[in-house]
Amino acid sequence: ALDPAADCPASRVAEIIVAPYNDVDALRQLAERCDVLTYEFENVDADGLDAVIKDGQLPQGTDLLRISQNRIFEKDFLSNKAQVTVAPYKVANSSQDLAEIDLSKNYVLKTATGGYDGHGQKVIRSEADLEEAYTLADSADCVLEEFVNFDLEISVIVSGNGKDVTVFPCLLYTSDAADDLLCV
């Protein structure tokens, strides 16, 4: 396993290479030690993986990884290719793209790449939030999403091999405190 933290959960069951997920030398070491590689989230360097894997060593490939690493690509893929309903959104390449938003609605502005768990995001509820939103939109390509009211948040892992598809049990996210997120 590759992880920046020596005491990561996988360390209890696997030999660990301690390095950032974008360390190509560490990815190479991992590829040399393993017959098959997988990844569980989008914080892995797709170019680095492509540079070090052997044919067939990464069954899921990097196409979906690249899509999931860019919110613009992800929204386009989900809404146009997968026909999934997503929150109303628009691409914002600069603060000018935010000039005429309807402030009777709430939004979240998210950087297209690099942001996660609230990083690279700005909630827009009123005109008072626009200055920070303009700064963010001028610093990177972004996606402006309308807020969607929801009752719960789940994660679903789906795995396929081109013939068979497996849907794993859903994970329900609950929050007992402002910063504590639990999966049950």
Where are the model-predicted features located?
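Short glycine-enriched loop/turn motifs at secondary-structure junctions
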Residues: 11, 59, 83-85, 113-118
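N-terminal low-complexity segments that are often proline-rich with Ser/Thr-Pro
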Residues: 181-184
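ATP-binding N-terminal substructure of ATP-dependent carboxylate-amine bond-forming enzymes
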Residues: 1-69, 73-76, 96
